[in-house]
């Protein structure tokens, strides 16, 4: 029996978007869901209790980074990642593939795996499909990812075809290496760049392997948003309706809503936490850069329509002061707000699906947020 089970609750009559639940060994979470990213077994500046309070049903951790520090064996010794970081709800781990291809300037891709340099100290390392699974088995996450290649955008059709074929072979090898299928659900990752024929081939290959869930990778890597939406429209119908669909690395409010409309259930991104550290906040009326001088004497909350801890207790003027002085508490406050904003947005999206009005909600949100303006700024 699979460790992961998807339950469809309702389909939105306006868009076909899915409302559901995903059942895991560490509990159930509602979908669509945004997953905060805890790269090194922590969501930067946030406690597990705070994440639960804001409605995070699942968080993500990074296999590559935990492999390097503190090492998967230490985490196994601690009783697994859940005990190590004191998080008793579901955890998803990536395979490390994206970090290998994005952080290492020197890498050599072979059929057996990837030889590359440790981005911390320059040491030579090797990561294979089997090793990526072995590390994740030691971590004990509820949902694991297959090892895949993440080609940059744009890439030629010829290169992408070879990459997709290799990723499919790696997925099969990883599935065979998986030692804990009853405790951990392993997802296959659909690749293919912007090429619809290669996306179809990748999806066909992976569906034939009968994974308990499917990820859509290789998007949000520099391609225009209309390209991403086109690829999603083509790809999600090729994936089983009775299994979860996870769009990797996407976290801007507009892309979350558009992804849900195109059949996606799960999302993750460092965006809300990364921009928070620079003092950029997501609000119901658009992006707010708290460092701007116009907020020096502004004693309103970041977002007057927000009921998060930050907005109920602190002013723009105070948070601006903290961020400008590089005080950690300022980063905590903006991080809390941004994560709460996205998690609450997904709660609103789920409510709109339940009421069969997601297309209307999208129009209202885009109008209020400013995405419909010709000069709209992307995050």
Swiss-Prot record:
InterPro entries: ArchSynthase1/Queuine_TRR (IPR050076), TGT (IPR004803), TGT-like_sf (IPR036511), tRNA_ribo_trans-like (IPR002616). This is Queuine tRNA-ribosyltransferase. The keyword Phosphoprotein does not apply. Residues 249-255, 273-277 are annotated as: RNA binding. Binds 1 zinc ion per subunit. Its EC number is 2.4.2.29. Homodimer. Within each dimer, one monomer is responsible for RNA recognition and catalysis, while the other monomer binds to the replacement base PreQ1. The active site is at residues 94, 268. GO terms for molecular function: metal ion binding; tRNA-guanosine(34) queuine transglycosylase activity. Its cofactor is Zn(2+). Zn(2+) binds at residues 306, 308, 311, 337. GO terms for biological process: queuosine biosynthetic process; tRNA wobble guanine modification; tRNA-guanine transglycosylation. It comes from Listeria monocytogenes serotype 4a (strain HCC23). Catalyzes the base-exchange of a guanine (G) residue with the queuine precursor 7-aminomethyl-7-deazaguanine (PreQ1) at position 34 (anticodon wobble position) in tRNAs with GU(N) anticodons (tRNA-Asp, -Asn, -His and -Tyr). Catalysis occurs through a double-displacement mechanism. The nucleophile active site attacks the C1' of nucleotide 34 to detach the guanine base from the RNA, forming a covalent enzyme-RNA intermediate. The proton acceptor active site deprotonates the incoming PreQ1, allowing a nucleophilic attack on the C1' of the ribose to form the product. Belongs to the queuine tRNA-ribosyltransferase family. Substrate binds at residues 94-98, 148, 191, 218. Keywords: Glycosyltransferase, Metal-binding, Queuosine biosynthesis, Transferase, tRNA processing, Zinc.
